[in-house]
């Protein structure tokens, strides 16, 4: 698996860093707190180590497929710098925020011309969307949308509805 921005925030919290605890993180921490005391510390250490060991992205099928949480530009594929890891986790932002307080993101996929297909998510959309050999499969399961997967190499999209709404989106995506 590849890490997402929320995974890395949880890892930082488990390592004792000061992070802003939002609803999703609060839920995760509350679930961890239900563990018996004799298992909690070991679990937190093991979880933090697992998350810390994840790579930012995968280059698969002899370079024909890239999987990253928020995307991956062609020139970054297969590299492991902090800049590459940040792009894989967050994409690229303008430095501005929208009317909902969320970062305004550059549409990196609109300029993508790489040879590998890139599968990513991070920014929920109503339907999976192919653009320039990239596909965003984040169809907002956490917000009551769909959980979507891409079968490769068939390029078959499979979506199943969320069982429930786990969180309310900061801005509508449907």
Q: Each predicted region: which residue ranges?
A:
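Short aromatic-enriched loop/helix-cap "lid" or pocket-rim segments at secondary-structure transitions
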Residues: 12-16, 77-81, 172
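Active-site-proximal beta-strand elements of phosphoester/diester hydrolases
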Residues: 65-71, 135-137
């Amino acid at each position: 698996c590849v890490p997402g921005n929320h995974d890395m925030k949880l890892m930082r919290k488990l390592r004792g860093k000061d992070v802003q605890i939002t609803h999703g993180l609060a839920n995760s921490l509350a679930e961890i707190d239900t563990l018996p005391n004799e298992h909690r510390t070991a679990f937190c250490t093991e979880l933090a180590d697992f998350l810390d060991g994840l790579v930012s992205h995968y280059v698969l099928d002899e370079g024909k497929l890239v999987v990253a949480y928020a995307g991956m530009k062609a020139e970054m594929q297969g590299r492991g710098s902090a800049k590459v890891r940040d792009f894989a986790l967050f994409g690229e932002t303008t430095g501005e925020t929208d009317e909902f307080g969320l970062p305004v993101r550059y549409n990196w996929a609109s300029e993508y011309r790489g040879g590998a297909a890139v599968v990513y998510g991070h920014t929920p959309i109503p339907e999976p969307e192919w653009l320039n050999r990239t596909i965003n499969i984040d169809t907002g399961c956490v917000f009551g949308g769909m959980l979507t997967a891409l079968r490769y190499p068939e390029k078959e999209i499979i979506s199943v509805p969320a069982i429930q709404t786990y969180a309310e989106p900061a801005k509508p995506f449907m």
